[in-house]
Amino acid sequence: VYVLDSVRGSVTCFSSTAYGASMMQAVRLYEQGMYAESEALWEELLRQNQFQELAYDGIAKALLARGEYARSLPYFEKANDTYWYSKAFNEYRVEAVRAALPTVFAIAAILLAVLVTVKKLLRKRGSQKEKRPGAVRLAFSTMAHPISGYDEIRYTKQYSSFLAGAILAAWFLFSMIEYQYTGFLFNGHKPDSINVLLIFAKTIGLFFLLIFVNNALSTFMDGESTLRQLWISCAYALMPYLLLKLACFGLSHALSLEEGVWITVLNGCAVIWLVWQVICAVQTMQQYTFGKTLASLLFTVVGLAIVLFIAFLFFSLLQQVWSFVRTVFDELMLWQ
């Protein structure tokens, strides 16, 4: 490339560097589908520039062409190539399943034998007196039978603050793990951009804000639940949601891009199940009718929006006051 400079009256000649020449040659081979021939060039380019995504993609396709599916996956991930990552993962999964089948069948047979043995031992011991279900057992019963489960909890007054707190802590911790370690094909977040405070606000903070708003509304809607009953029962409502989200997390490491619809379906089921659990919890604890429960939840969402708007105005005003005080302080310092 020749560049004319009329001011200086000169001609400057630009020629490609060794790196540029290697890049052009590697790209030419890559576009022709000659991945194996371009592999050495890509490796040399990566030694000079570790942030060259096309080099990772070229090496990954060379490994894929040789049938080295497991080795190609990290390269496709660094190249951010979800399409070919999914193709390589499909082939790798077939090999992994074939290799693991004997072990899986052996473990399943052992577990089945242990289960049968335990059942026989329990049968020999005979029937015992039926024990009154504890707080933990009642909490888990709400997943399958939410209405009767919450009603029994309210009647027996067996609330476990420890279990409810553990559920909320698990939700917060799992949200961080999900953000960071969801499978590459289904993770739209950057691992280095995690904000723990934001995740805390979206989980624990949002949960208690909704609880406080709903509890405040219950004063005007003749609700019978206490604040403790309300937050514990709503924490119990998170259990099936967390279980389905955990299943989605596991599937994100086991499914290809084309099979991602199952994760979408499970996520939808998790949200629907959560909404139904919350409706049952609020209706039972507050002793509302179904229609009144829906109205209460709708007003709760509206109240949450109002609280967030007021909080935004407050922090905006606080920022303006701080800016004014800082400006006055700087002006006073200049006068000295």
Where are these regions (language model features)?
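Hydrophobic alpha-helical transmembrane segments and adjacent short intramembrane/lumenal linkers
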Residues: 198-200, 210-317
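TPR alpha-solenoid repeat register
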Residues: 21, 55, 88-89
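Conserved beta-propeller blade signature
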Residues: 1-3
